[in-house]
C-alpha cells in the first residue's frame, strides 16, 4: 500500500473518518467502482489494514493519511502532501465527526472545542482547499450530517448545532455551484448502528433503542447513490424521511421538547 507514490487515475476520492462506520462502508463502495482512495483517520495501523484489504479486494490503489482533524493544521498538511504527490481529487467526503451527550453546563469544553474543530472547521477547511481542483474536474462533495441538522438538540446542543451548520453550508454551496458540473450532497442519516453512540456517552438514552435506527451499510449505499445522482439532501429510511417532513411543519418549541425527552438520560 502506498503512502507517498503519486496517483495517475481519472477518479480519486478522499474520505475522512474512514476507519469505521459510514466512512468505511463508503470506502468499499468507492473502491468497488474503481476509485482510487485517500483514507483519513487517526489510527495508522487500522488505516493500513483497511487499505490492504481494499487493495486486495478491489484491485485499486489506497493512500492512507493518518491524521487527527482535531488539530487545526491537519487540513493544510494533507493538502500539501497530496499536492507534492501529484494527487488531484474528484470527490471529497467530509465524514469525520463525533458527538457529545450531556447537559451543556456539565459537558467538557475541551471535548466540545474538539468537536467543533472536527465537525465544522475541518470539513469547511478541507472543502475550501480542495474545491478548486474538484471543480476543475467536475467532481463531487459529500458531507455527512444527520437528521439532527433539522432541529435543536437539548442535551446534545453543540453536536446538533454542528450538523445544522453542515446542512446549511452544503445547501448554500450546492446552489453556488449550480451549473458548474459539481454537485454537493448532504447525507442526513438518523440513528445509525455504529460506535458513535458509545463515544458520545449516549448509553442510557432513549435514542439507543430508537425504531429509527438504520443499518450503516444501507446509509452508506443511499448516500453514495444520492451523491452520484446529484441529490442535495439524502435522508436514509422512510421513517426518518417522514420524521423530517413532520419537523418542518411542527412548532419548533414543541419539537425541541420532544427531542429533550429522547436525549435525556432515562435516570434523569
Task: Label each residue range with its predicted role.
Residues 146:
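Residue(s) in the substrate-gating loop at a strand-loop-helix junction
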Residues 33-50:
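Conserved glycine-rich Rossmann-like NAD(P)H-binding loop of the short-chain dehydrogenase/reductase
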Residues 103-116:
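Substrate-binding pocket helix/loop in short-chain dehydrogenase/reductase
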Residues 127, 162:
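Active-site helix of classical SDR
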